[in-house]
Amino acid sequence: MSALNLTVRVHPVVLFQVVDAYERRNADSHRVIGTLLGSVDKGVVEVTNCFCVPHKEHDDQVEAELSYALDMYDLNRKVNPNESVVGWWATGNDVTNHSSVIHEYYARECNNPVHLTVDTSLQGGRMGLRAYVCIQLGVPGGKSGCMFTPIPVELTSYEPETFGLKLLQKTVGVSPAHRPKTVPPMLDLAQISEASQKLQQLLDLILKYVDDVIAHKVTPDNAVGRQLLDLIHSVPHMTHEQFTQMFNANVRNLLLVITLSQLIKTQLQLNEKLTFLPSA
């Protein structure tokens, strides 16, 4: 498959690690680089992890601690054997003169390595994210070169990462003085209530879109229509009585789990107090 047909999907933990490495950089370092880890499947490069590689850039050369990079990769393989090298990342918004030298090293580590640039300066209030592949150029018998060509890049996340991002969004507008140091887990019933409210808001948004399309206020989108049709077909067909019975059964199971968890919590607290009770 051609490198130009690749699509890069980046997980949020990668961006957090890049920002953390940039904040911890040396005072004389203007750019931070590192290795991208993940997997490649059917033209999709999924970046799930990364680590920083210490380096120094001079006018005519680049010095990188390759032994450190190999040690970090070996350690990561022991924990995540499914992750392999898929490319490298760098802070900044542009490809520099030294990028081709660094990319040449990663081309020996994997096929079609991708280069990810992360704009940590937050120009325009956003973190710019770009992905490139290196395309070889030249004529037969002449000098050859390479050109960094942009490829599509998008953000993706697993379900636990999505919950973590939602929790971060809740505290992003809170001042540090009033921000709690610890966030207790939300009760199960409260989570169901919050999820139901969000589902109701999304349903209202969909109904408004459908009404606007019927009233010719909005131009219909075939892609949205197909997604809505697939959504309707995915809903199981059942009567009102069947749905009520199933819902009540799930609520009873949830209440039973909550009761058992509270009993276990009380038992553990009682056991802790009895353990540290001074003997007579």
UniProtKB/Swiss-Prot annotation:
Keywords: Cytoplasm, Initiation factor, Protein biosynthesis. It is found in: Cytoplasm. The keyword Protein biosynthesis applies. It holds the Pfam family MitMem_reg. GO terms for cellular component: eukaryotic 43S preinitiation complex; eukaryotic 48S preinitiation complex; eukaryotic translation initiation factor 3 complex, eIF3m. Residues 8-138 form the MPN domain. The keyword Protein biosynthesis applies. SMART domains: JAB_MPN. GO terms for biological process: antibacterial innate immune response; defense response to Gram-negative bacterium; formation of cytoplasmic translation initiation complex; positive regulation of Notch signaling pathway; positive regulation of peptidoglycan recognition protein signaling pathway. GO terms for molecular function: metal-dependent deubiquitinase activity; translation initiation factor activity; translation initiation factor binding. Component of the eukaryotic translation initiation factor 3 (eIF-3) complex, which is involved in protein synthesis of a specialized repertoire of mRNAs and, together with other initiation factors, stimulates binding of mRNA and methionyl-tRNAi to the 40S ribosome. The eIF-3 complex specifically targets and initiates translation of a subset of mRNAs involved in cell proliferation. Component of the eukaryotic translation initiation factor 3 (eIF-3) complex. The eIF-3 complex interacts with pix. Belongs to the eIF-3 subunit F family. HAMAP family: eIF3f (MF_03005). This is Eukaryotic translation initiation factor 3 subunit F-1.
